[in-house]
Each structure stands twice: as structure tokens, then as C-alpha cells.
UniProtKB/Swiss-Prot annotation:
Domain notes: Has the structural arrangement of an alpha-helix connected to a beta-sheet by disulfide bonds (CSalpha/beta).
Name the record gives this protein: Potassium channel toxin alpha-KTx 1.15
UniProt-annotated site: Aromatic residue of the functional dyad, residues: Y56
Keyword tRNA processing: no
Record carries keyword Disulfide bond: yes
Listed Pfam families: Toxin_2
Disulfides per UniProt: C27-C48, C33-C53, C37-C55
Length: 57
């Protein structure tokens, strides 16, 4: 029972990973990524991770 729950949780979490798109734009705060993501992918959904913008669809 525990294994099936863990597998289900892994599948649900991995869905979000495939929707993320990395960019080479450097950042220090997530709000710096919003115009970048809006320009590149048409949606302002993004955040700053490890000094680079990561956009979500």
C-alpha cells in the first residue's frame, strides 16, 4: 500500500517537471523572470532558481 502511494506521488510530482522550461537569463529575484517568461513563452509564470529564470506553462 505504501509503495503504490509513493509511486502515485512520484507520477503527480513529475508532471510539473515536464512543463518547466529553462532559460539562460540570469536573475536574483523571481519578479525579474516574469517579463522574460512572458516575452519568450507568452505567459509570465516563472521564478528564479539557482540564478537563472525558469518558466512554467
Amino acid at each position: 500500500m505504501k509503495i503504490s502511494f509513493l509511486l502515485l506521488a512520484l507520477v503527480i510530482c513529475s508532471i510539473g517537471w515536464s512543463e518547466a522550461q529553462f532559460t539562460d537569463v540570469k536573475c536574483t529575484a523571481s519578479k525579474q523572470c516574469w517579463p522574460v517568461c512572458n516575452q519568450m513563452f507568452g505567459k509570465p509564470n516563472g521564478k528564479c532558481m539557482n540564478g537563472k529564470c525558469r518558466c512554467y506553462s
